[in-house]
Regions:
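A generic structural signal for short beta-strands and their flanking turns/coil linkers
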Residues: 16-18, 39-43, 75-79
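Solvent-exposed beta-strand sheet faces enriched in polar/charged residues
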Residues: 23, 46-48, 82-84
């Protein structure tokens, strides 16, 4: 399974999002630190979920980072997060 798909599946299971978009931006970082041949190192996530209601931006990021801890400890070098509650979207 590709990293992008694994990220999407884990976030879906953890947060039951109303919307989720996972973008592989690795191609934009060729030649930069953390880039590896084959990509799948730099990602951007847009997620809207009730789970984020009443949570601070930092708390939301922590929730996502905990969910993706194995990916962040492994092949993922960078993860940009845009997490919102439904009323904020």
């Amino acid at each position: 399974m590709q990293t992008k798909q694994r990220i999407a599946e884990k976030l879906t299971l953890a947060f039951s999002p109303q919307s989720l978009e996972v973008l592989d931006e690795s191609h934009q970082h060729e030649g930069h630190a953390g880039h590896r041949p084959g990509g799948e190192t730099h990602f951007r996530v847009y997620i809207v979920s009730d789970a984020f209601d009443g949570k601070t931006r930092v708390a939301r990021h922590r929730m996502i980072n905990e969910t993706l801890s194995s990916e962040l400890a492994g092949s993922v070098h960078a993860l940009a997060i845009h997490a919102k509650a439904p009323g904020e979207a």
